[in-house]
Amino acid sequence: FIEVLQYAAKRHITVIPEIESPGHARAAIKAMEARFNRLKGEDMEKAREYLLSESADTSKYVSAQAYTDNIMNVALPSVYRFMDKVSDEIIKMYKDAGVPLATIHIGGDEVPKGSWTGSPLCHKFMEEKGMKDTHELSEYFLENITEMLSKKGVKTSGWQEVALHHPPEMNARIAPRFAGVYCWSTIGKRDIVPYTVANEGYDVILCNVNNLYIDLAYNPHKDEPGLTW
């Protein structure tokens, strides 16, 4: 990765790292489950250090990619240790490469309805914090991760969902921590999204799915290769 950064920098290309969270995280979740299973017989505390899932979670959801197990459990302290550790490793690699780190993209998109609803840990956490719904749980995660990165001197980036449906006071707190919000789902009635995000105080980066996603078909004809969602 360090070689990639240096290769890109010589060609005036900025590489933006992304830690997909809390959704789209199946690879990380499964990797940390494997780590847990490998270490639990020796040191349970160490095994749980970066765990991203709760064994008692019975939440029923289906992601846009048809997964039922790709959402980090944001009530787990180990999730925040994981994000802290991974971001530190990213920062170190950029320093070793001698390349400035513009921002870390945290994802934030496509957390399906039903996530966390069957998690005993999430229910307990929400009750303790006086949260009314799981949206407030996701806002807690967002507040904490953006604050953590800010303390490291790193700006946050994210998909459009990170900037939507928050109270004004929350936007006022977190918008300055963002380098940019990537507005991707802007088709039809959603063409208002970039304006909404900008009006909430975030810098907008337009990445309209119909223009910039290279795996989409040019048109929906059956013989045209590519996706048409």
Report residues per predicted region.
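Substrate-binding cleft of carbohydrate-active enzyme catalytic domains
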Residues: 1-152
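Substrate-binding groove of N-acetylhexosamine-processing glycoside hydrolases
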Residues: 77-84, 88-104, 124-229
